[in-house]
Structure formats: C-alpha cells, structure tokens
C-alpha cells in the first residue's frame, strides 16, 4: 500500500445541512417579541416593526457584513481600492403561533420560510411591557421556546409520515432493494422525532449514510439554532433577569450544544442613532457593550461557513467557503479557471503575517507554505493561487 500523502489529512465527515455558501439564517419566534426591531438594528434597515401580530408578512432579507479585526487589519495594511468582507444572509420571518403546523396564524407559509433557511436565530422575549401585547397573554420565554420547538417538530413529523408511506410502498411492498437502506434510516428518524419527540440535531451520532438521507429531506429540526434572549435595557446592563437561568437550564438539558446570547433590542436601537463618540461614551458610562458583532459571527459559524482572504493593493476580500473545503474548490470561488487549472495554493496564516509584518518576512521566517490540491483551507488563511490556462501560467 502506498504511503499516505502528508497533506491528505483526516477523513472529512459530511455536515448536516444544505451544501453551498449562499446560506441564510432566519429570525424565528412568536409575534411581538422584537424580531423586526432586532432585524433592523442588525441590518441597519427600516423593516416595519409594529405592536400587532404578523406585522411581518413577507420575510425581509438582508446581507450583514461579518465583523472581523483580521479583515480590518489587512485593509489598513494594503489600503486597497476595493474592500469586500464576508456577509451573513439574514431573514426576518413572520411570528409563529401555537398550531402553525396545522395552519394557525400564517401556518404553512411561515414554516416554508423557515425551510428556505439553513439556520435559526431563535428569538424570545424576556422583558415586561404593558404596551406591547404578548400573543400568549404573558411573558414566559421557556414556554415560548417549547411552542416553537413543538411546531417545528410537528412539521417534520408530517414530512416523515409522508416519506415513509412512499418508501414503504416502493422499498417494502414493491421490493426495491436500492431504497431499503433509506427506508430503514427513515424508520430510525421516525423513532427519534415522532416516538421520542426529539429534534434531529439533539442526536449527535448520525453516521455518514444517515446524514446523506437527512440532507435529502432537510428537516426543520436539523437546522442549527442560536437562542437570543431579548431583555430590557435595564436588565441587560445589570446582567440580571429572572428568566435567564431558566432558559439556560432548558437549553443545557435539551439542546446542550447550542449557545444562549442575551441582548437588548432597545439598547441596540438607541446605540444605532448615536454618533461613534456618543456611543463610546454611553457604553463606558453604563459599563456594557453591544453584542451584535458576536451574534453575527455566531450565526455565520453555525452555518458551517468560514472564509479565506486574498489581499493586495487592488482588493482585500474575504471569500466564503464551507468548512472542510479543499484548496482547488476554494480557488473556484474566485473563478472556475482557478479550480480547473489549479497548480498550488501559496498560504500565509494571518497571525504569521501580522507578527512578521510583510509577505517577504513571512517567507524569510519559513512560514510561507505551498499547498497541494488535498490541502483543507483554514479560516483566515491568506492565499495566492497558482493555476494553468491553455495559453499560460498565471498567478493571483
């Protein structure tokens, strides 16, 4: 057996979710919990935000730049003519109500909007305000989490029953052996979601073949979820709220790999109207900070996305790729010719570039690497691709 190439790396396991880089994360929650306000401050847009259920009917969508100090450093260093950061696609989806899976509220339209997304910002209200009605009559974010979770699970249940009915006709009664493995896997999924009333992502030991089947159906409960707790400005600043511990306990029990991020929509909205100087002074006085950057970065990472940089005086750009992407496919994000004629990737680590101060110094320090087609691109790599065309060899 020939020796394994040094840059082959460990075997890549498939990721649950849609393949690609034009992925979306949806803001999901009950009506009147601050979704549109959060969307507005996140995207600096002016989507309608009113005090009545279903203010958002058709989903609003926007691209949000992913904040990154590495990108800013490269821009300051090169002073390029063009600056292109990575972006997170965010969708503001109409409020869900109990019974949506059976058509209540906006029902199936709402759930189809979630289906079109690849991750979920699960927003919940943990502030009291007599002027803002709550669709359930009282503020109880743990109850609200359970409503959302159950509606998503029920929609998946509907999809599983339909799929199993079809597979049983073909694979079991029809004797199609090719579909029998899919049928067996779907029986396991049924047991997990319908019989045990769990979400797909709560099970962490799906094997490669099972993940392939899950990715065929893209169940709502398979989507990564980040829990965002909307607090009053007062509670956020003092870091105290009676619901925070209860929410954390629920998430730790049922969705232990998920993150819970408290924020204040009112605070973020107020900060948006301030100048940079006023904002800095206000945050210092209140001994607090905005968490919008953290939320955007967390959402981007939850979609299994990362990026590499190309950097020079013409342009500094962050190129979005899926985690685990090999060098030729990363090159193809720039141009298909780069992938077709791939020769090598010349790679610098950002930290090495920052420490050494220039590309030539990185080379002199022996930290400039030439990587082949089996190299897995890492987040923050600074890359120059060499590739062949029918006419000549080029470098970018």
From Swiss-Prot:
Domain TGS residue range list: 304-387
Domain of life: Eukaryota
UniProt keyword annotations, A-Z: ATP-binding, Cytoplasm, Hydrolase, Magnesium, Metal-binding, Nucleotide-binding, Nucleus
Principal place of residence: cytoplasm
Function (record text): Hydrolyzes ATP, and can also hydrolyze GTP with lower efficiency. Has lower affinity for GTP.
UniProt xrefs under HAMAP family: YchF_OLA1_ATPase (MF_00944)
Family: Belongs to the TRAFAC class OBG-HflX-like GTPase superfamily. OBG GTPase family. YchF/OLA1 subfamily.
Record-given protein name: Obg-like ATPase 1
Organism: Xenopus tropicalis (Western clawed frog)
